A protein has these predicted regions:
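Substrate-binding/catalytic cleft of secreted carbohydrate-active enzymes
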Residues: 1-76
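Carbohydrate-binding surfaces of carbohydrate-active enzymes
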Residues: 40-55, 74-173
Length: 173
């Protein structure tokens, strides 16, 4: 299993570009190629340290539904079969159990379920991925393959026509 925070652990700066991970060539994945690939701590929010100039609502926008859809597609294609999102359920840190560097009393992180129990848009994207896995159980037993050979095929120019109320217009590409 793996932990993965691909765009940043906190939302204090610009998001990192989401990479196509190529998990199938990662040494740890190669060593366990007949085992399920599980992201045990998958990014659901971003860290808000004490005294930061941003809060959980900024982190909610930082780690949004668009991120989840793209990240899920990349991981599904790479053979990841299970995700555990951290943290999917925001909460409150009571009783001085946290340290100042670990966050405010809020332990929300912009999670899919907010500290005040509201559903955020990204929860739908996570559920979509879960339903996708349920609909296609074959994903859990598929073997990876090498990248296909790309061929550059060129042909004649393409001509398209656009019909408008004023007549027919020709566009060449």
């Amino acid at each position: 299993s793996y932990d993965d925070y691909p765009i940043r652990f906190d939302c204090s700066a610009t998001r990192h570009k989401l990479q196509d991970h190529n998990w199938h060539i990662d040494p740890a994945f190669r060593a366990a190629h007949h085992s399920p690939h599980f992201i045990a701590e998958a990014q659901d929010g971003a860290f808000t340290p004490w005294g930061a100039s941003f809060n959980a609502s900024a982190c909610e926008k930082f780690v949004d539904a668009n991120f989840y859809r793209q990240w899920a597609a990349l991981n599904n294609g790479a053979g990841v079969t299970a995700f555990n999102y951290y943290m999917i359920f925001g909460g409150t840190n009571w009783g001085w159990t946290g340290s100042a560097h670990s966050g405010f009393t809020s332990y929300d992180y912009g999670a899919s379920l907010s500290e005040d129990r509201n559903l955020r848009d990204k929860l739908s994207a996570q559920k979509e991925n879960g339903y996708f896995h349920r609909a296609f159980p074959q994903l859990t037993v598929m073997d990876g393959t090498t990248d296909p050979t790309v061929r550059d095929v060129r042909g004649a120019a393409v001509k398209s026509y656009l019909r408008k109320a004023a007549g027919l217009h020709s566009l060449s590409m």
